[in-house]
Amino acid sequence: PKPNGFLVLDEVPPAIHLWLLSTGTGLGPFLSILNTPEPWQRFQRVVLVHAVRTADELAYRRTIARIAEAEPKRFAYIPFLSREAADYALAGRIPQAIGDGRLEARAGLGLDAALAHVMLCGNPAMVADATAALAARGFRKHKRKEPGQISMETYW
């Protein structure tokens, strides 16, 4: 069966960079996307962000490591931990890291509405707050009749 809805690459307008921002189990749809040829054919850089409470909740580490090994110059993985600290992860929450620039700094890539498309999947509060943080930077929700730079799905 062919995936449908808005959280599929068929619905993403042309962009140079693809940012995939997830919390918890919202990571799943993005791994499905990353395990196809399409993102690597369409985008110069892909950034996968996964936010959870503790390191034990960081899922699919082998799958993500395999993607990073296959696309070392084009793929960045940024884990977030909200309830404990680790050198390899950003602390706190995704929307705040968008606002204060930590997300871009860790990715080594600017979050620019002229170049990027952002897909959000996960906790409804993260989706809403990240959408607001991105809107403050000129990003708009993508609609079929009004192309924008943000696609989203709450996944709780």
Label each region the model flagged:
Residues 1-19, 36, 82, 137, ...:
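FAD-binding FR-type
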Residues 9-12, 39, 108-111:
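Glycine-rich helix-loop-beta junction characteristic of Rossmann-like nucleotide cofactor-binding loops
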Residues 15, 38-46:
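Conserved S-adenosyl-L-methionine
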Residues 18-21, 119:
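Conserved beta-strand elements of the Class I
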Residues 23-29:
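Ser/Thr-glycine-rich phosphate-binding loops at phosphate-binding pockets of nucleotides
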Residues 31, 47-50:
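Extended, folded domain segments that form the structural surfaces/walls around functional sites
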Residues 49, 54-156:
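Reductase modules of NAD(P)H-dependent flavoproteins
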